[in-house]
């Protein structure tokens, strides 16, 4: 900081500079010092002929400035540092360029925060000859470099070119005009060296480029370098000018549009036809309501919200909330219903056209249509389709909507954990919106659509609520007539909606939810059904999608059977369709290759004899047979469901039912030497199956005297029961009679009847209880080639409901006690010997 008062310093500086006045300037000009103080410059060098300000901060250089101001010559040397990052107070002569300028102090203006602003006039080029002081400040002997005064024709041409370039710059940047006036006051354009220095000083060239010009003493080379830098500056100024023009044009257009809109508003107000955005919003909402029959309680809410909208400021946050709320309220199709199709014959054709089989579901939809026709309208229903993946649960929903002439909306609830997805969010939350039910009505624009809730058995729970519980109100015919969405907060009638729910299993669906649904089971398809589906639906559809024709590609009946048996044994037809697509894609590649080869041959023939007409391409007919199937699909994935062609002792085949459909299940028993009679169970059996094994073990212990009097088996051996495919978890009670039969086969050392399968839950007293999945198990038995089956007697009604083509070719015995199972399993009991 300055120690002396600012006024005193300024007076001192003025007194020191008075020597520049009153004809003493010429005297000083003749007294160029041989030794000067040197001030380092960091950013860019100065050139002779310039006048420029320089800020001197408090410190050593400020003290030097005081000394210079009191000297006779009042001159300092200004030299550029070699590095722009140099520390100004630690710079030595080795850190400076050798060429700089001599600057004369014209005026010193002290600053309040300390230091001073110095107005300098650049006099001459100088060269640092010999440093004389390098302690706190820099001082050196200097020599002066004079320009050659001779003006050649070439230099004159260069000068004219520089002047014309400067004129162009003045047009683009008026700021250069002031600097040009200062130069004209101190210099003459007939001196090309000074003109080059001035031109370079106008540019924004790098410090190294400027220093290079400063160190160029040859006037011809200097003016050439100056012209190059000046041309670069002109190019930059032109580019900057174009950018500014574009920006100004955009701004001016926006301002013009704004003023025109304001004028238009003013004119409309004067004419009485002004309508702002708020009025337009209100008119839009009111226009929607004219097309709808809105319930009175909902209309009351809409009216209140419209009044609130009219008094709110459009810029307020609440305005957008109210506007969004009204948008939803007026978009719901209040009182709008699709005209239903009550023609049974037409509906039956649509359902038959889209899907093969599924008679239970088709019959249920026809019942729905029939009741609607007689009752002049029918309330919505809730149908639950349960079955393994790929059997057509989702696609049948679209067909049902088409058959009823209703709009269709599907969404998956699998993995859903937030009840707000069903019932909506409260309007107080940011980004709130109605639930899926209201969204479905808005999308369909009718109050009686078909809404499908896919994968309802895979819903989850979280701290955000239980979506399954939220569905209780939606799927209850007695409650959904007054469904309340959290966002709308008004009653909405869902009683006309036909809900279709799909699931793979019922076990994970809560009982209250199951109780509200009409459950229809879609069992897996058997061979005959898959063949018909492939021929009538899958092959024609995919052949058309891939641009293939029926004459080009065909499948034999045997090939389709081989695909189903060897590659696609799952209950549905999704994997079967993927395999057919794979075959068709490979055939498409083959046909395209044939066509390319044909085109090449035709092109060659056309070159050799131009007169011949090209022959049209006729693709080779491709027929898929069992012999060439491996070329498309590789080796078969499945060989046989049966481990044994002839059932050995201690082995019995059971029937299982999973989410993927029916399957066969072997129960194997062997005896192991041991001191104690113990039963061991392996094969990833669940808790229920373990209990079934214990029941079977106890039943055999208590009843063996009936089947093999006088046996001593349990006194000698331990028993190990195993369920093959140990990596697959298994559970359920239906293997009870199978386990008993396996144990008795082991004890009696007699195999069970060949091609026999059984299923049924067993009690400790030998009663056989009913099981589930009759159709699925029958399909699995047919796939495995079983000829005789044993089912619980209580499942007879399920069996009789099955189509004849599923029951045909298999003998089924219905039993209610294990004694009957024993007689069927071991028909030659009188020939058995005891072990």
From Swiss-Prot:
Triggers of expression: By heat shock.
Stretch forming the signal peptide: none
Compartment(s): Cytoplasm
Entry keyword set: ATP-binding, Cytoplasm, Hydrolase, Nucleotide-binding, Protease, Serine protease, Stress response
CDD domains assigned to the protein according to its UniProt record, in alphabetical order: RecA-like_Lon
GO biological process, one term: cellular response to heat
Chain residues that bind ATP: 387-394
Active site positions, chain numbering: 734, 777
Lon proteolytic domain location: 646-828
HAMAP family recorded: lon_bact
UniProt function note: ATP-dependent serine protease that mediates the selective degradation of mutant and abnormal proteins as well as certain short-lived regulatory proteins. Required for cellular homeostasis and for survival from DNA damage and developmental changes induced by stress. Degrades polypeptides processively to yield small peptide fragments that are 5 to 10 amino acids long. Binds to DNA in a double-stranded, site-specific manner.
Subunit structure: Homohexamer. Organized in a ring with a central cavity.
Record-given protein name: Lon protease
Upper taxonomic lineage: Bacteria, Pseudomonadati, Chlamydiota, Chlamydiia, Parachlamydiales
Gene this protein is translated from: lon
